[in-house]
Amino acid sequence: MGVPERPTLLLLLSLLLIPLGLPVLCAPPRLICDSRVLERYILEAKEAENVTMGCAEGPRLSENITVPDTKVNFYAWKRMEVEEQAIEVWQGLSLLSEAILQAQALLANSSQPPETLQLHIDKAISGLRSLTSLLRVLGAQKELMSPPDTTPPAPLRTLTVDTFCKLFRVYANFLRGKLKLYTGEVCRRGDR
């Protein structure tokens, strides 16, 4: 007789270690398939959006930042191969990570950055790193390595934002939209 498994305890431990940037070696490879994991990151993104929305005009960025377009054509998305979806999600996540890091640099250069804003930027950076790690375990990064005889993926649609509120809105919408659709499909198929 072995020790009874405690998936809830494992999930809680994993959620505590992931934001620290520590590899979670004992985590199940399909941790992202647990809806509570993704919902936690979505909630953090929405909280950041709400905090920045609470300001009169919201803190402005000193320059425009390019972010992925979060609009989803559900008909086209369902017709895409999972590999194409993975490429779009991976590219979007990479661009979003760059955008948040750029916002962090702009915030650091401003005089007296709001402490709560800095906290949400730091949480977003940690969350994106964790999501990137979880997607690697899921195998999403492998989809970027396409054979030389295939056509290159369509360029990622982008837009620019000029406030922290808009940046966090894109972050939340990307997680709720493309990332959730992709992980849901992969987890349903059980391919990874």
UniProtKB/Swiss-Prot annotation:
It comes from the Eukaryota. Residues 1-26 form the signal peptide. Its main location: secreted. Keywords: Disulfide bond, Erythrocyte maturation, Glycoprotein, Hormone, Secreted, Signal. Produced by kidney or liver of adult mammals and by liver of fetal or neonatal mammals. The keyword Secreted applies. This is Erythropoietin. It comes from Mus musculus. The lineage of its organism: Eukaryota, Metazoa, Chordata, Craniata, Vertebrata.
